[in-house]
């Protein structure tokens, strides 16, 4: 009896395997419930390669796709780094390519979809990106483009899906695609999303991101799911060529006296509790330990309130709003994106200056209207929390102001990338407003060690700053 492979709910079933054959096949375990051997679907390529190399006969009932032809409607003339990335990826037909926002990751994927010639499932984090990808794919392929997400369930040889929808369907669609493309692939190692990769047999995998690093260090797991980091280009390498030239200005803002007093009081309450409870945020579970300890006593709950207050005061001080107004006045005629850490701050700024606000709560028709008005110049300023961090194309933006954000380097590189799409004569500038002598200041210092921030200028905490040097 020959060995047979079957796909079953995101795994592989192996029937008829001999004991001596199993010693050659890693990650294969006996399943008492089904009385057969089972392996993760992600191991399909490795298992099939081993079986062929060892000349072990087998029947493949798992794979439900075959080679396909996707001719391009128009010629692509890749930039040199895109061609290098494509050539490098094609050697293994697996791997992660890290390119800055605006450097043409989508066009690279189009090239590789055509070269690979396999039914392709493209994963994206948002519905906006799903629609954006479909528009580009329709420009280059005659083949119908399917969508999976936002209430649409239309599977085609080339399909774009949100990570959430792909996760739902992988148990029964995981054997129908030969190439998986993961846009913003740094999401992939997440506790849930990783199963979109684990549950698919696709032998060919392309990860796309601007910054593969994760705060939790799980980029190693990303490479296990998608292939190693095979090509990388940094923002500073493309500045002034493929991307617009840019500068980053960190502006230290001095809190108002009443804000400073509240901050110091709250900070003292919070840090005293940390010392007393011996909470160490350098520990991998430091944050979880802090949350647990703050829930165990009235003192802990007060410390948690103090933590939230000191954080809010440093991120959303009135002095920052004053400085933002100065920047808005200085950059009249430019297209500005204002970034905040949370929706509350974004809406506060929107109300203060009568500006349109984009968040995850903004309905799609309103979002599209805001983005169109931004492109035409009717709305020269957009305020957003995190919804523009990834993917949404705003090529006309040339000024970014980060009022507040997380400690994530990726988030700040993504926000920088929002304003770097090249235009003739374009000079981009990103301002970071940082409350001086606070935890936010030291977070900013760590972030500036990233190479994208080399050459950053730190402007001292003074009001009435002259910004003419940034023109």
Predicted segment positions?
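Walker A/P-loop
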Residues: 91-116
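Conserved SF2 helicase motif VI
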Residues: 99, 211-212, 408-428
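Post-DEXD/H (motif II) to motif III coupling segment of the RecA-like Helicase ATP-binding lobe
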Residues: 186-247, 258-261, 265, 272
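Conserved helicase/translocase motor-coupling segment
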Residues: 282-363, 367
């Amino acid at each position: 009896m020959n060995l047979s492979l079957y796909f079953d709910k995101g795994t592989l079933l192996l029937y008829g395997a001999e004991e001596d054959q199993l010693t050659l096949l890693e990650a294969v375990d006996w399943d008492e419930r089904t009385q057969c051997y089972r392996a993760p679907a992600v191991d399909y390529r490795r298992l099939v390669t081993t079986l062929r190399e060892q000349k072990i006969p087998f029947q493949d009932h798992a794979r439900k796709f075959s080679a396909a032809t996707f001719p391009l409607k128009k010629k692509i003339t890749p930039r040199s780094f895109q061609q290098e990335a494509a050539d490098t990826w094609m050697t293994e037909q697996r791997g992660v390519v890290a390119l800055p926002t605006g450097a043409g990751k989508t066009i690279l994927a189009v090239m590789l979809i055509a070269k690979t010639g396999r039914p392709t499932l493209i994963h994206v984090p948002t519905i906006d990106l799903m629609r954006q990808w479909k528009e580009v794919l329709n420009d280059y392929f005659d083949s119908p483009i399917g969508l999976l997400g936002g209430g649409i369930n239309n599977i085609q040889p080339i399909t774009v899906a949100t990570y959430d929808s792909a996760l739902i369907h992988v148990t029964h669609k995981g054997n129908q695609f030969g190439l998986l493309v993961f846009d913003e692939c740094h999401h992939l190692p997440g506790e849930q999303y990783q199963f979109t990769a684990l549950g698919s047999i696709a032998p060919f995998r392309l990860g796309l991101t601007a910054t593969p690093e994760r705060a939790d260090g799980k980029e190693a797991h990303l490479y296990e799911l998608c292939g190693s980091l095979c090509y990388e280009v940094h923002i500073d390498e493309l500045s002034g060529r493929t991307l617009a030239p840019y500068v980053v200005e960190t502006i230290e803002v001095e809190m108002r006296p009443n804000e400073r007093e509240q901050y110091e009081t709250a900070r003292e309450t919070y840090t005293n509790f940390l010392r007393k409870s011996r909470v160490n945020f350098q520990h991998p579970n430091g944050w979880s330990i802090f949350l647990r300890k703050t829930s165990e006593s009235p003192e802990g709950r007060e410390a948690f309130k103090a933590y939230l207050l000191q954080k809010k005061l440093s991120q959303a001080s009135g002095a920052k709003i004053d400085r933002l107004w100065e920047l808005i006045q200085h950059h009249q005629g430019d297209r500005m994106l204002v970034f905040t850490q949370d929706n509350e701050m974004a809406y506060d700024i929107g109300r203060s200056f009568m500006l349109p606000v984009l968040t995850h709560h903004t309905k799609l028709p309103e979002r599209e209207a805001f983005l169109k008005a931004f492109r035409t110049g009717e709305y020269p300023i957009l305020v957003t929390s995190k919804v523009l961090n990834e993917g949404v194309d705003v090529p006309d933006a040339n000024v970014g102001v980060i009022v507040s954000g997380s400690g994530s380097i990726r988030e700040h590189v993504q926000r920088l990338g929002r304003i770097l799409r090249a235009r003739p004569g374009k000079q981009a500038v990103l301002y970071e407003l940082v409350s001086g002598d606070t935890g936010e200041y030291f977070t900013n210092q760590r972030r500036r060690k990233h190479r994208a921030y080399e050459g950053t200028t730190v402007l001292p905490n003074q009001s009435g700053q002259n910004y003419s040097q940034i023109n």
